[in-house]
């Protein structure tokens, strides 16, 4: 409308000048039809035409500037997209077009007859500052190369209210130990061998409107059984929280505050960043991560505040129920947080820290602290080369438990040493414009007390039952556990939404831990009493100590059954992963 009115005003003025300017000439000739025009009148017509031509140029210029301003002020279609527009100052416009800055040599232009109010309105609109949209945090570079980030760059369908997300993850494992019960232990990603399995089918996405936000992602498949199994907190108190939460990997809601570069406050179930690797295998450089990732939390239940002081820095404190816990295992919540910094497009620095939590079920005075620190560097980037990118990630973890009969340093007064030290290093290569990927890496841990070792599911053992007793793989204070692993991963990525992956892994522990040929399932299946020893006849011994179990099994003409645990494991896993 403003454009239309401005055009109408200018054209009305131009027409008025064109009609009225010759009137004095007609007045002079009205006395006699044969009177000839004077020399002065003959010169007036070219001057008027020159002024009208200058005014026409001026109008065209203003119309073009209004159109450019309107385009620049149009909202961006995608979050993080910035359309920078800087209006020309009046002096700049005049310098660019000398004819419009001085419509007549004398400076006494008929353009001065334009209404001052109209000129002021036009100038005000033209010189009003245009504030570019603020950059979204971490949006000014391509971070799809990071380990733990999805590589999808385009969304097929998006709205102002909802951004959908769909994930599917299927795998097949060949375990060279060939367990007769097909059961794999010591992993939070692989659980069965010689079978095709659905790891996760996730449907959900992000809801966002008027600064209110929410996210939902489901986890149908193996994750819905295996992830809750590693949480001891449901053993504290009543209500079947595992059934309530098992099919949800993320579910939270919150609000976005437009301060600094953004502040988000969310509450619910959200993913943990400890261990660098994403909970979703599609996002990672490898399928089976090393111990400092696989043995640390995948989710938290609580409240987080994401503070973005700059576009390259995030400070995120957590108030959570505990260490990968739906409930609180004792009487005190956990506190923690993350600092993420990306000073350059080729480097990512992350520090995660956790403390205060009391996460050992039935041991209320034992406290846990942990730090997890990572750096990722893209040190080679030539998109047109056959080998187009190279990057590495290095993660180091340290932590301990103290109180309740254990200590961080193993002194006599505090009890046996209960600590965690570990690292992992991966190097990633991309080929042929990211059509192929190759990752080599591995890691090592030392975890006396075994409080972060993934408990083998012997006879259906879970984190809850192990808090009472785990007869076949103990987790007593000071129990040793040292392990290392290595892997090589090859990816074929024909589209940004799918990955075909082949991976070889070798893992070693200093104690029998991995499933061997004989399996980890009792002869007649799980007895329903994982805290008790099992007899070879397939029945439970009713005893939690080995001498009592031997006596009980002998009484029925049997012996004590033991799982087949090995110090070494190697396997090949093949997977198809999809993300929209």
Question: What function would you assign to each model-found segment?
Answer:
Residues 26-181, 471, 580:
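N-terminal periplasmic/intermembrane-space "pro-region" immediately following the signal or transit peptide
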Residues 143, 177-193, 225-252, 258-341, ...:
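Surface-exposed coil loops of outer-membrane beta-barrel proteins
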Residues 148, 162, 198-203, 246-253, ...:
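Hydrophobic, lipid-facing positions within transmembrane beta-strands of outer-membrane proteins
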Residues 149-164, 177, 210-214, 258-263, ...:
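Short loop/turn motifs that connect adjacent beta-strands in outer-membrane beta-barrel proteins
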Residues 190, 227, 236-241, 347-355, ...:
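Outer-membrane beta-barrel pore domains
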């Amino acid at each position: 409308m403003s454009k239309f009115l401005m055009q109408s005003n200018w054209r009305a003025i131009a027409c008025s000048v064109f009609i009225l300017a010759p009137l004095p000439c007609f007045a002079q000739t009205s006395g006699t039809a044969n009177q000839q025009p004077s020399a002065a009148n003959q010169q007036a017509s070219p001057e008027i035409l020159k002024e009208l031509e200058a005014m026409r140029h001026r109008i065209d210029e203003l119309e073009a500037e209004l159109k450019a301003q309107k385009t620049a002020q149009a909202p961006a279609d995608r979050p993080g997209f910035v359309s920078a527009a800087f209006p020309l100052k009046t002096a700049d416009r005049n310098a660019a077009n000398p004819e419009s800055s001085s419509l007549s040599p004398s400076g006494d232009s008929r353009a001065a007859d334009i209404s001052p109010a109209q000129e002021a309105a036009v100038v005000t609109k033209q010189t009003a500052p245009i504030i570019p949209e603020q950059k979204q945090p971490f949006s000014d570079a391509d971070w799809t190369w990071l380990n733990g980030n999805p590589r999808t760059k385009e969304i097929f369908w998006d709205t102002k209210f909802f951004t959908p997300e769909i994930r599917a993850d299927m795998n097949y494992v060949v375990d060279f130990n060939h367990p007769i019960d097909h059961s794999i232990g010591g992993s939070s990603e692989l659980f069965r061998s010689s079978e095709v399995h659905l790891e996760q089918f996730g449907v959900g996405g992000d809801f966002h409107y008027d600064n209110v936000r929410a996210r939902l992602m489901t986890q149908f498949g193996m994750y819905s059984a295996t992830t809750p199994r590693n949480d001891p907190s449901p053993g504290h108190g009543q209500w079947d929280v595992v059934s309530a939460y098992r099919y949800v990997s993320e579910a939270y809601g919150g609000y976005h505050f437009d301060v600094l570069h953004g502040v988000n406050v969310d509450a619910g179930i959200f993913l943990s960043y400890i261990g660098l690797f994403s909970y979703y295998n599609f996002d990672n450089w490898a399928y089976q991560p090393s111990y400092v990732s696989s043995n640390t939390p995948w989710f938290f239940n609580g409240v987080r505040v994401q503070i973005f002081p700059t576009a390259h820095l995030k400070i995120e404190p957590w108030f959570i129920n505990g260490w990968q816990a739906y409930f609180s295992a004792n009487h005190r919540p956990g506190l923690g947080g993350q600092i993420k910094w990306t000073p350059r497009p080729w480097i990512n620095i992350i520090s995660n820290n956790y403390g205060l939590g009391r996460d050992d079920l039935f041991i209320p005075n034992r406290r846990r602290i942990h730090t997890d620190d990572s750096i990722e560097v893209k040190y080679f980037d030539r998109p047109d080369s056959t080998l187009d990118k190279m990057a590495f990630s290095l993660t180091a973890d340290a932590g301990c438990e103290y109180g309740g009969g254990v200590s961080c340093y193993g002194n006599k007064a505090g009890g046996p040493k209960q600590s965690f030290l570990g690292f992992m290093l991966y190097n990633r290569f991309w080929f042929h414009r990211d059509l192929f990927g190759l990752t080599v890496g591995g890691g090592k841990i030392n975890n006396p007390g075994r409080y972060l070792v993934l408990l083998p599911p012997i006879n259906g053992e879970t984190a809850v039952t192990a808090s009472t007793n785990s007869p076949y793989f103990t987790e007593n204070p000071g129990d040793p556990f040292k392990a290392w692993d290595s892997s090589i991963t090859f990816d074929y990525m024909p589209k940004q939404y799918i990955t075909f992956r082949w991976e070889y892994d070798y893992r070693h522990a200093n104690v029998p831990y991995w499933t061997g040929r004989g399996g980890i399932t009792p002869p007649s299946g799980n007895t329903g009493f994982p805290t008790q020893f099992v007899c070879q006849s397939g029945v439970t011994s009713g005893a939690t100590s080995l001498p009592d179990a031997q006596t009980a099994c002998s009484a029925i003409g049997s012996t004590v059954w033991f799982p087949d645990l090995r110090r070494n494991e190697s396997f090949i896993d093949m997977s198809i992963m999809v993300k929209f």
